[in-house]
């Protein structure tokens, strides 16, 4: 209880608030100087990703309330009662499943027709999904809207492929860090805009003439409007990044998304497969342990819903500025492979340090290592993946990375939740650090692909297959 009081009292002190304000202004100034260095093409993409994430996060925090309004206390099917919690879980799972299944397909589609038209189609699907969400009058329609949204939202790999197309290999980790900082900003502002939309929905839009209110449809309508504006922005300003001059060599055919997805499992020692596994295991270990974070902080440090916001504000601030200000310089000094290893170690140390912290100062130090670790790990792993695959297959493999990472994000919280309940409140963080450190064994030998100008032979990464091999595989299936 003392820690909780210290947190609350510290932020109510005028001196602390003035100091935090001064630091914020200084950091914003430095941030603006860095933003001005971003190439115009990437700045356009970052604006697109920011608005897309802004619309998505307008809806997600409100979803449970819409389900509660439409579902009441739940319903019975074949003698089984499905409560509100279970219904929300199914709707969230439907979105995730649609996103995971669509990610490699969107990636391969973008390899064939281009990144720009793929993003335009996906944004159109998202706009439709938001409108369905806004005007949903039943759980079935709400469920349908989340499937459409998930299918249209599997384009993270396409955006990452655009970055890889548009940057030199040595600058990709820096650019991916900028991109993730932008989406983090959308995550922070989206819920606020969603709450504003709800209040706007209660107002009469035509006072004195007729009563026109958007009501509960306001967040969906505003999110759809953002998507349409984003489509216009992309159509007008975003240039195609895909180079269609590269062609497969004679006697070789390109793998389908199904073949490539299975190859990550069947040829797990290949560089591309190892990088995808590193990403999937690490992001599952990190985000899975954070699924029970609020419960852990409450049990160990008496942090409540009134004070946990300070925790995430601290975490988010370090994350954004690390990705924008530090990541590029650290890549120049260490290289992607070494920096990703350092990131894994820092992330594992931060996660492990939380249950070992005995006071507020130690907790603050441990937590500070986590955004450093994520900033150094995930952009560097993705940048390395872009090096070991052929340009014409980037969309496919970036999409597969998101698919495997998504599966990990589904499975890991279930395991860590079980560990929290049945082993102990600190158990998820011990397991998480162990899984993170285990990924270091998958990174041996990847340094060669981080050297300037060094690209792996495509056939060594398993990206191309001879026609005879493809025919054999088709015959076996």
Enumerate the predicted regions with their spans.
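Helix-to-loop junctions at the C-terminal end of transmembrane segments
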Residues: 102-113, 322-336, 420-421
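Short amphipathic helix-loop junctions that connect adjacent transmembrane helices
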Residues: 62-85, 291-307
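Cytoplasmic helix-loop-helix junction between adjacent transmembrane helices
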Residues: 145-183
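Conserved MFS/SLC helix-loop-helix module at the cytosolic interface between two early adjacent transmembrane helices
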Residues: 100-137
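C-terminal membrane-cytosol helix-exit motif in multi-pass small-molecule transporters
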Residues: 224-246, 439-447
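Intracellular juxtamembrane helix-capping segments at the cytosolic ends
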Residues: 155-167, 376-389
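Juxtamembrane intracellular "pre-TM" segments in multi-pass secondary transporters
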Residues: 32, 239-278, 299-300, 463-469, ...
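C-terminal transmembrane helical hairpin of 12-TM major facilitator-type secondary transporters
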Residues: 337-381
């Amino acid at each position: 209880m003392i820690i909780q009081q210290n947190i609350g009292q510290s932020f109510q002190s005028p001196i602390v608030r003035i100091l935090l304000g001064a630091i914020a202004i200084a950091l914003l100034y430095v941030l603006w100087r860095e933003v001005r260095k971003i190439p115009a093409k990437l700045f356009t993409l970052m604006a697109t990703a920011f608005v897309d994430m802004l619309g998505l996060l307008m809806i997600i925090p409100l979803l449970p309330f819409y389900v509660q309004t439409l579902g009441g206390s739940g319903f019975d099917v074949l003698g089984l009662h499905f409560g509100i919690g279970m219904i929300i879980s199914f709707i969230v799972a439907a979105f995730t499943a649609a996103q995971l299944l669509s990610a490699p397909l969107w990636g391969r589609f973008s390899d064939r027709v281009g990144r720009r038209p793929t993003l335009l189609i996906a944004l159109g699907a998202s706009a439709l999904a938001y409108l369905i969400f806004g005007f949903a009058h039943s759980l079935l329609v709400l469920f349908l809207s989340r499937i459409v949204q998930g299918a249209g939202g599997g384009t993270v790999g396409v955006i990452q492929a655009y970055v890889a197309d548009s940057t030199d290999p040595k600058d990709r980790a820096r650019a991916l860090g900028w991109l993730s900082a932008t989406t983090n900003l959308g995550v922070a502002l989206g819920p606020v805009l969603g709450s504003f939309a709800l209040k706007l929905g209660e107002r009469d839009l035509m006072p004195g003439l007729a009563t026109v209110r958007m009501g509960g449809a306001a967040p969906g309508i505003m999110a759809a409007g953002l998507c349409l504006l984003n489509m216009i922005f992309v159509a007008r300003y975003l240039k195609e990044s895909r180079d269609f001059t590269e062609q497969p060599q004679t006697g070789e055919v390109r793998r389908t998304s199904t073949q490539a997805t299975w190859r990550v499992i069947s040829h797990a020692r290949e560089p591309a497969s190892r990088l995808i596994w590193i990403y999937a295991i690490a992001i599952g270990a990190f985000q899975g342990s954070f699924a029970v974070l609020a419960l852990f902080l409450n049990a160990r440090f008496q942090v409540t819903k009134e004070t946990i916001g300070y925790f995430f504000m601290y975490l988010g601030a370090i994350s954004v500025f690390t990705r924008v200000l530090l990541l590029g310089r650290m890549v120049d000094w260490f290289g992607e492979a070494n920096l990703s290893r350092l990131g894994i170690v820092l992330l594992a140390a931060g996660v492990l340090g939380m249950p070992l912290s005995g006071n507020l100062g130690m907790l603050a130090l441990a937590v500070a290592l986590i955004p450093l670790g994520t900033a150094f790990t995930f952009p560097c792993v993705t940048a390395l993946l872009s090096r070991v695959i052929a340009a014409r297959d980037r969309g496919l493999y970036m999409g597969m990375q998101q698919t495997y990472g998504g599966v990990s994000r589904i499975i890991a919280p279930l395991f860590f939740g079980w560990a929290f309940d049945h082993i102990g409140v600190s158990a998820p963080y011990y397991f998480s650090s162990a899984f993170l450190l285990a990924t270091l064994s998958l990174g041996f030998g990847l340094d060669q692909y981080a050297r300037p100008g060094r690209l792996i032979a495509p056939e060594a990464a398993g990206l191309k297959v001879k026609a005879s091999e493809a025919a054999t595989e088709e015959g076996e299936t």
